[in-house]
Amino acid sequence: MTQLMITGDGNTPLSPEELADLIPNLATREELNEWERENILRAREWAVGDRTGSNDMVGDEYVGKLHQKMFDQTWKWAGQYRRTERNIGIPVQEIREKLVALFGDVRYWIANQTFSPDEIAVRFHHRLVAIHPFPNGNGRHARLMADLFLMKLGRPAFTWGSRELVRQGEARARYLDAVRAADNGDMQPLLEFVRL
């Protein structure tokens, strides 16, 4: 097993086939995290300048395009929905159907002001993570989607516990606990965490 295949709590393991689609020549998980971080920073810069409105970003095309921008220098499959089952997320054949339902729900929540903008963004993030549409990067993608959604509404991006969440540590553990609470219907811990 290579160092790249070793995952921590909350990290999605990749298949050997998915690992073979790594673009740069990296040997360790730390190198991969740093490479992806740089790729994501470029994607964030692109997304902040993008003129897509909040309603239009809640759709299949934008979700895939953002993931592609976030990982296009890292993975050949960037922006493509996963084709293999995971220890997290829904069955592969349900991904598109569940995303369409999520997009409809978010648009309804916006139009009817069902929840505050923060709660809509948290629920959007949580459902994206639960669906787990991509082979890797789902949490980072969902967090950036939530931040961009808020910014399009003129609100500040979330702080996400004011810590780096990719590496193992107290902030990541608290984030994962909040996501698991949301899995059980309690959104409050995640709502609190995103504004710490």
Model-identified regions with their sequence ranges:
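FIC/Doc superfamily catalytic core
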Residues: M1-L196
